[in-house]
Amino acid sequence: MNDPGDIPLTHTSTPDSRPPCSIISIIPTIGMSSCRGRAEAFARSLSSKLRTLGSQTTEEGEGNAEDEPIINGTSTNTWVNSHDSEQTVTDLQPLRHESDSFFDFDCELESPGSPVDECEYLRLIETASNTPHNSTAESGYACASMASSHSSSNDGPYFDASASTSTAAAAQDQTLPASEHKEYVNTLQLNGKHGLANGVQEEQPAFQDDVQEDEAFLQAQILNELQKHSNSLTEVEQTKPEEGKLTNGHLEKVEELELKDVLEVAGTTNRAPKVIAAPQEVEAFADRSQEQSPNDRVQKESSQERVPEGTPFEGVQGESPSDRVQTDASDERVQEEISNDTVQVESNHKSATESISTEVTTLERSPEESRNDELSPDSGVDETDKSASNLTVDVDLAQIEQAKQDATEAVEKSGAPSRGTTVDTTDDEDDCRPQRIRRCSSLKTGKTPPGTPGRKKIVRFADVLGLDLADVKTFLDEIPTIPKSAFEDLEILESEPPLQLGPKSDKLLMPLFQQPGGLPKFLDAVREKQVSLENAAVTDNINQTISGSVRVRNLDFHKSVHIRYSLDGWRSYADLQANYVENSCDGFSDIFTFVLFGNSLHVGQRLEFAVRFQCKGQQFWDNNYGANYCFQCLPSSTHTAGGSTASPPSVATGAVSTGHSASLVGLLSPTAGDAWCSSFY
């Protein structure tokens, strides 16, 4: 099935002057025999390629018949049957944007009937069939990639790219005819402008001989310069044997790495096919090369890295490892120039001139500069090798310097006794010298082992000097007498100053009850009434603070104690909750505490209170058997030395006159006055 604009296989639109691209012309070059089955597979692949090219030419314009690629000029050179032309052809391989691809014949053909033979046909027909008639050359390499993942399983066999290269070694150095040396072209439309063409135009026979001569001339010049530079560096190496020994361990590793780079340069120079383009085609290529996409440039670099290592130059094999290390910078530049010459097809003569001039400039530099270039980032040497080389040299130099210093110190130490005069020291001279004061200790310091020779120790006993060996002192049990002279410097105050206890209060609170906790039957009272005041006293005479404690029966875990007090004879009252004392339970009773403030009382007033105990929904009272617990506010007593001023009657001081005794009893009596409320409880 053909779409409108597709080119049929049985006739041609325009005559083609090129030789027909037939299977007969390809097989002798590769050294294979024809087979009908492989030919049919080849025809299917060719039909797929023609379908792809037909769709591209339809986009550019169907009326341009001269631009349509014609592969087989006549119907006699095709193997496509009538039913094959009506079948739907799938895409064998998508269009690639690689501008730098190459023939890769380094695969081993297992046998003449191996599936690899068909793969070779597929690769060659991709090169021949995907190039338009008027395409412009752009690269010096031919396409060598396999069918893409988009191709059908029936279009071509599977090819194992990791096969060995024993059988294809014979076909490696063969060159295709000029009519078959074409490359697959990828044409893309960019915003309605002219398309990008990646590929190689067919070689023109007029320039083929010139290309070979230029390549031979370029290789001869490079080898000659490399040989001269190697000889000069060998002489320099012989004059500096010590420097070579210092870095010999590192240079051997670098030589092995750089040898591979030199061989890659040689293989690239020997086996890379190049094409000379016509002047008008070179100009068209220059315009299109500037419009290459980043993807094309990345694929170009990957294609250059895939160039296999070919047969190295004989001159390179004859070089010594040290020469290859020294000339690494030159080889890197030569490889760069050769790669640029392969990608760019402007002029081989100009590229050769630039390569030779660069080589001569490199050879004129000193060996130290060449060595620095080897370790520079531009030379391609890994940063790890650079740092390792610097570290090796630094360590070796440091070891040499340390050895020299050790030798110098050893000589100085051995020669010091001979140059100086030996001085004999005696014990007498040691005694004349001022001895250093040392801290006496009966313990060994542990710094020197016992038996180590040192200073002589001189021991003198007291009896030798006429002194007593022992000094006896007697201690008596009696209290020693202190002489008066020991107190002469002491100042004894005859009169003590009065104590300053703060401001004095003009009133005081006097309890009118006896403390229940001091009574012998206190616990019996607690057992009887379930609650009882234990004690209550004034703790602060300035603020008139009363602190007290209450003991209650342990009837239940939940219990509460309140103090009900009044300052105006029970005309009004207030309740104060007492606080439980932690860990006060003895199994029989618990203790609660409270604090009352009577600073608002005036002289002659009373503070009365009673205790209420609540437990299990019941209330228990302690009101001092109906008399309540009272504190009387009295004026404070002031005594003078002359006694001219009589203090008011006070219960605390007992200075109560006989005439006022009856009235005082009535004042202190809990039953006197209208303030008592007997029906309160």
UniProtKB/Swiss-Prot annotation:
UniProt GO cellular component terms: protein phosphatase type 1 complex
InterPro entries: CBM21_dom, CBM21_dom_sf, PP1_regulatory_subunit_3
Disulfide-bonded cysteines: none
Matching Pfam families: CBM_21 (PF03370)
Biased composition (Acidic residues): 59-69
Gene Ontology molecular function, alphabetical: glycogen binding; protein phosphatase 1 binding
Region annotated Disordered, chain positions: 1-20, 53-94, 232-251, 285-391, 405-435
Domain CBM21, residue spans: 525-632
Bias (Polar residues) ranges: 72-91, 353-364
Phosphoprotein keyword on record: yes
Entry-annotated residues carrying Phosphothreonine: T545
GO BP annotation list: negative regulation of glycogen catabolic process; positive regulation of glycogen biosynthetic process; regulation of glycogen biosynthetic process
Keyword Phosphoprotein: yes
Bias (Basic and acidic residues): 237-251, 297-308, 321-336, 365-374
Sequence positions bearing Phosphoserine: S547, S549
Record's keyword terms, sorted: Phosphoprotein
Protein name: Glycogen-binding subunit 76A
Lineage per the UniProt record: Eukaryota, Metazoa, Ecdysozoa, Arthropoda, Hexapoda
Gene that encodes it: Gbs-76A
